[in-house]
Amino acid sequence: MSSIIPAPRPLNALAFLACLAAIVGALYLQHVDGLEPCPLCIFQRVGVIAGAVILLIASLHGPKNIGVRIYGALTTLAALGGGAVAARHIWLQNLPADQVPACGPGLDYMLEVFPLQNVLQQVLAGSGECAEMDWSFLGLSLPGWSMVVFAGLLLVGLIQMFRPLTR
């Protein structure tokens, strides 16, 4: 089985490029197509960026055995955190219209006015703008595509954590 698994460094580099493509795509949709991200979208971007940074450092560092596993564990944590936010976002988008939470203040305002813990609670509770589906591709909304990215990150992280040790 290990013969079909790429070496750690190229796998990390490839996953980093996938994260980079996801972020570039999100920025294109925001700045070229005018699709403003909701607070949950911004949190998902943070998850993808965290995964990208971990993968870039891992691919540049090129550690052996325990280092590969540590970077894999960190990648897995980023994927699980981002995936949880994406799952919450997908759930909000699929609520019946009468159960959608009211729109709240923007993330910038909340960060200026409220303590960080309150901001996290309010963002994860969701708001009306997070329930809107303004864009889809192949039947998936942006949070759906984020979930695909996080599933890929999770797979890479688990492969790195449980790959056979080398000498």
UniProtKB/Swiss-Prot annotation:
<keyword id="KW-1133">Transmembrane helix</keyword>
<feature type="transmembrane region" description="Helical">
    <location>
        <begin position="12"/>
        <end position="28"/>
    </location>
</feature>
<keyword id="KW-1003">Cell membrane</keyword>
<keyword id="KW-0472">Membrane</keyword>
<keyword id="KW-0813">Transport</keyword>
<feature type="disulfide bond" description="Redox-active">
    <location>
        <begin position="38"/>
        <end position="41"/>
    </location>
</feature>
<feature type="disulfide bond" description="Redox-active">
    <location>
        <begin position="103"/>
        <end position="130"/>
    </location>
</feature>
<keyword id="KW-0812">Transmembrane</keyword>
<feature type="topological domain" description="Cytoplasmic">
    <location>
        <begin position="64"/>
        <end position="70"/>
    </location>
</feature>
<dbReference type="GO" id="GO:0015035">
    <property type="term" value="F:protein-disulfide reductase activity"/>
</dbReference>
<feature type="topological domain" description="Cytoplasmic">
    <location>
        <begin position="1"/>
        <end position="11"/>
    </location>
</feature>
<feature type="transmembrane region" description="Helical">
    <location>
        <begin position="71"/>
        <end position="87"/>
    </location>
</feature>
<feature type="transmembrane region" description="Helical">
    <location>
        <begin position="145"/>
        <end position="163"/>
    </location>
</feature>
<keyword id="KW-0143">Chaperone</keyword>
<dbReference type="Pfam" id="PF02600">
    <property type="entry name" value="DsbB"/>
</dbReference>
<keyword id="KW-0997">Cell inner membrane</keyword>
<dbReference type="GO" id="GO:0009055">
    <property type="term" value="F:electron transfer activity"/>
</dbReference>
<protein>
    <recommendedName>
        <fullName>Disulfide bond formation protein B</fullName>
    </recommendedName>
</protein>
<keyword id="KW-0560">Oxidoreductase</keyword>
<feature type="topological domain" description="Cytoplasmic">
    <location>
        <begin position="164"/>
        <end position="167"/>
    </location>
</feature>
<dbReference type="InterPro" id="IPR022920">
    <property type="entry name" value="Disulphide_bond_form_DsbB"/>
</dbReference>
<feature type="topological domain" description="Periplasmic">
    <location>
        <begin position="88"/>
        <end position="144"/>
    </location>
</feature>
<dbReference type="InterPro" id="IPR023380">
    <property type="entry name" value="DsbB-like_sf"/>
</dbReference>
<keyword id="KW-0676">Redox-active center</keyword>
<dbReference type="InterPro" id="IPR003752">
    <property type="entry name" value="DiS_bond_form_DsbB/BdbC"/>
</dbReference>
<dbReference type="GO" id="GO:0006457">
    <property type="term" value="P:protein folding"/>
</dbReference>
<keyword id="KW-0249">Electron transport</keyword>
<feature type="transmembrane region" description="Helical">
    <location>
        <begin position="47"/>
        <end position="63"/>
    </location>
</feature>
<comment type="similarity">
    <text>Belongs to the DsbB family.</text>
</comment>
<dbReference type="InterPro" id="IPR050183">
    <property type="entry name" value="DsbB"/>
</dbReference>
<keyword id="KW-1015">Disulfide bond</keyword>
<feature type="topological domain" description="Periplasmic">
    <location>
        <begin position="29"/>
        <end position="46"/>
    </location>
</feature>
<comment type="function">
    <text>Required for disulfide bond formation in some periplasmic proteins. Acts by oxidizing the DsbA protein.</text>
</comment>
<dbReference type="GO" id="GO:0005886">
    <property type="term" value="C:plasma membrane"/>
</dbReference>
